[in-house]
């Protein structure tokens, strides 16, 4: 299913203006900093709970809170994006997320002077507010703006440039600082032994960068004009409601949403729990785990995003490309789970090496999924002016695991936590990974159904490509 493109990479890159490339780089930056503290830091910093002064299952609990808020705000976010300037929504998101991150930093700085319950309650509120600022006014506007920087033929390449920029920003500002903190200030004796100042400074840096990137989006990223009226009328309300109803009636869009959910576990729960398993079950050195986490989360995204997106653009179907990535990812994670049956009471170099390689390979596939997942929309009929609503539904279903799945993993983790420890056991990690693997398999089945249906459709219509429709992303 791979076809040769008419243009080489350099010629296709020239299709982008300097303004568009700059915009994609800026969008990569704001993507890093808005998502970093709520989601990605725990995938880079092993045993994040020690720095926060809480337990591992409580980290899963606060993550589930942001997931539930995401569920409540994802679809309204699509409505807002259809109605208001995406650029201004991103600016508002960056400023408010930055303010909340300042609050987080202050709590980390004073955690030894606060009770455990007081800290945990504040973290619950912080993660809940992040759910609003990183979803309602951020997620759909981000991808709508990124999509507008490229033609329909270069959609994947455009997302690849944004993803590569994301990786570079994250590598410098998230990973390298985290590496310094974990290699020098890791609280090996428990959270009470941690020096709170370095990690608090880390949070302050993220907050400051959020404010800076917010203003760069406002002044340097262009967007297509949207149809507006001077005031909200009954007619415009009915039109927007109709767009949402059309989206909700699209069965293929629902199945692709479940497919995205299956892919998302590789980016979220696998990225977190397999890293924790490396640290706490396989007893890998904390610096090694931080390096692997940073490479997977940021360096790989920068290194492979453009290449994988070029490969996806050459493929007749983005859905097929994502199916291949998912199948390989399932195989690698299954192998990781099986390695957990190797009994060890001390660090096993062979075990750590193989599991680290599997973790990296899974990360490569994950970023292939991330950068192409919204390109699926171009292979189904979504109707006119429904792009943002379609992204909203995909994200609503796809990222719902941040809510209900982390609630499940928190309970499993708590049940299998050995008395006197703050993290779960090897068996707990295996059970959590197996649950996530079943979700990935379900998503793969859903994606396969849409691909088969599309194959029958293009055969009936005598089309040469799965991407024969015009992409309406205004």
UniProtKB/Swiss-Prot annotation:
List the source organism: Mycoplasma genitalium (strain ATCC 33530 / DSM 19775 / NCTC 10195 / G37) (Mycoplasmoides genitalium)
Q: Do you know which CDD domains this protein is assigned to?
A: MFS
Query: Short name of one Pfam family for this protein?
Result: MFS_1
Name of this protein: Uncharacterized protein MG294
For this protein, the record's PANTHER family field holds: INTEGRAL MEMBRANE TRANSPORT PROTEIN, INTEGRAL MEMBRANE TRANSPORT PROTEIN-RELATED
- Which superkingdom? Bacteria
**GO MF assignments:** transmembrane transporter activity
Secretion signal, residue range per the UniProt entry: none
Family classification: To E.coli YihN.
**What are the top taxonomic ranks of the organism?**
Bacteria, Bacillati, Mycoplasmatota, Mycoplasmoidales, Mycoplasmoidaceae
């Amino acid at each position: 299913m791979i076809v040769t493109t008419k243009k080489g990479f350099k010629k296709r890159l020239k299709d982008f203006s300097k303004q568009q490339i700059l915009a994609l780089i800026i969008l990569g930056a704001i993507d890093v900093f808005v998502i970093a503290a709520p989601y990605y830091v725990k995938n880079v910093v092993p045993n994040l709970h020690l720095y926060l002064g809480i337990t591992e299952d409580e980290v899963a609990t606060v993550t589930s809170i942001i997931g539930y808020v995401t569920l409540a705000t994802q679809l309204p976010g699509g409505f807002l994006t259809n109605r208001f300037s995406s650029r201004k929504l991103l600016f508002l998101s960056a400023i408010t997320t930055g303010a909340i991150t300042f609050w987080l930093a202050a709590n980390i700085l004073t955690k030894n002077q606060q009770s455990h319950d007081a800290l945990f309650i504040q973290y619950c509120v912080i993660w809940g507010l992040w759910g609003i600022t990183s979803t309602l006014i951020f997620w759909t506007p981000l991808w709508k703006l990124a999509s507008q920087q490229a033609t329909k033929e270069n959609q994947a390449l455009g997302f690849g440039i944004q993803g590569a920029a994301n990786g570079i920003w994250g590598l410098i500002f998230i990973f390298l600082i985290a590496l310094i903190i974990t290699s020098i200030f890791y609280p090996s004796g428990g959270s009470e032994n941690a020096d709170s100042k370095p990690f608090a400074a880390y949070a302050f840096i993220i907050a400051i960068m959020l404010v800076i990137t917010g203003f760069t989006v406002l002044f340097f990223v262009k967007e297509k004009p949207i149809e507006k009226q001077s005031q909200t009328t009954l007619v415009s309300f009915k039109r927007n409601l109709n767009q949402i109803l059309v989206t909700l009636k699209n069965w293929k869009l629902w199945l692709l949403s479940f497919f995205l959910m299956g892919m998302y576990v590789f980016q979220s729960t696998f990225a977190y729990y397999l890293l924790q398993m490396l640290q706490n079950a396989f007893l890998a050195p904390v610096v090694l785990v931080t390096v692997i986490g940073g490479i997977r989360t940021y360096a790989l995204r920068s290194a492979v995003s453009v290449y994988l997106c070029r490969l996806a653009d050459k493929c007749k179907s983005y859905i097929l490309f994502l199916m291949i990535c998912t199948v390989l990812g399932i195989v690698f994670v299954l192998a990781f789970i099986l390695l957990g049956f190797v009994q060890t009471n001390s660090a096993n170099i062979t075990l750590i090496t193989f599991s680290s390689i599997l973790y990296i390979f899974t990360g490569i596939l994950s970023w292939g999924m991330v950068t192409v997942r919204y390109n699926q929309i171009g292979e189904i009929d979504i109707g006119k002016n429904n792009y943002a609503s379609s992204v909203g539904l995909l994200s609503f279903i796809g990222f719902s695991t941040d809510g209900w799945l982390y609630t499940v993993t928190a309970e499993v983790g708590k049940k299998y936590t050995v008395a006197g420890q703050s993290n779960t056991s090897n068996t707990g990690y295996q059970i959590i990974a197996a649950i996530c693997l079943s979700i990935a398999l379900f998503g793969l089945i859903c994606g396969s159904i849409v691909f088969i249906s599309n194959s029958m459709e293009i055969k009936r219509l005598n089309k040469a490509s799965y991407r024969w429709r015009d992409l309406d992303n205004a």
